[in-house]
Amino acid sequence: MSPQTETKASVGFKAGVKDYKLTYYTPEYETKDTDILAAFRVTPQPGVPPEEAGAAVA
C-alpha cells in the first residue's frame, strides 16, 4: 500500500473565474514576427460579454 500524502489546494493554483479583460486582454499588445494568427468566429450567448466568449476559445 502506498503512503498517503497531504495536498494543499492553495499551492500553485487558485480556482475561480477571473474577468478576461482584467487578466489576459492586452489591447496595447504589439505583434512580433514570430506570432501566429488564428481567427475564430464566436457568437456569445445572451448575457455573455464578447470578451468572455472569446476567452472560452483562447
UniProtKB/Swiss-Prot annotation:
Subunit structure of this chain's protein: Heterohexadecamer of 8 large chains and 8 small chains.
Prosegment location in residue numbers: 1-2
Modified residues (N-acetylproline): P3
Group of enzyme by EC: lyase
Compartments, as annotated in UniProt: Plastid, Chloroplast
Official protein name in the record: Ribulose bisphosphate carboxylase large chain
Catalyses which reaction(s): 2 (2R)-3-phosphoglycerate + 2 H(+) = D-ribulose 1,5-bisphosphate + CO2 + H2O; D-ribulose 1,5-bisphosphate + O2 = 2-phosphoglycolate + (2R)-3-phosphoglycerate + 2 H(+)
Further comment: The basic functional RuBisCO is composed of a large chain homodimer in a 'head-to-tail' conformation. In form I RuBisCO this homodimer is arranged in a barrel-like tetramer with the small subunits forming a tetrameric 'cap' on each end of the 'barrel'.
Family: Belongs to the RuBisCO large chain family. Type I subfamily.
Modified sites of kind N6,N6,N6-trimethyllysine: K14
EC number: 4.1.1.39
Name of one Pfam family that matches: RuBisCO_large_N
Lineage: superkingdom: Eukaryota
Alphabetized GO MF terms: monooxygenase activity; ribulose-bisphosphate carboxylase activity
Function: RuBisCO catalyzes two reactions: the carboxylation of D-ribulose 1,5-bisphosphate, the primary event in carbon dioxide fixation, as well as the oxidative fragmentation of the pentose substrate in the photorespiration process. Both reactions occur simultaneously and in competition at the same active site.
GO cellular component: chloroplast
Biological process according to GO: photorespiration; reductive pentose-phosphate cycle
Native species: Euphorbia characias (Albanian spurge)
